């Protein structure tokens, strides 16, 4: 399991980014995405990347079933309207702290997973 930290200018952009991750990157979102305080998201990002160029206005966390390398590869191919950071076990304390806090966070309202249709092979 991998955690996505999604930072953006509005909740609409976060929801659109989640929809892009689900539909276009074809990553499996587990459960419901949760809202995180923007300052906390910026602090997490500074631990991972070093410098935060622009503070975010809204942020959320989502758990996905896929491993980090696959998630990174697929997210690179799409252009979501928000900044997405993939957080795996590799980040140790940050990853496990987020997993512990995840159930306590408020749910991001207004996001619904797309209904999966049977994918038929194209001829």
Swiss-Prot record:
Pfam family for this entry, one: DUF356
One MF annotation (Gene Ontology) recorded for this entry: hydrolase activity
Protein name, per record: Uncharacterized protein MJ0949
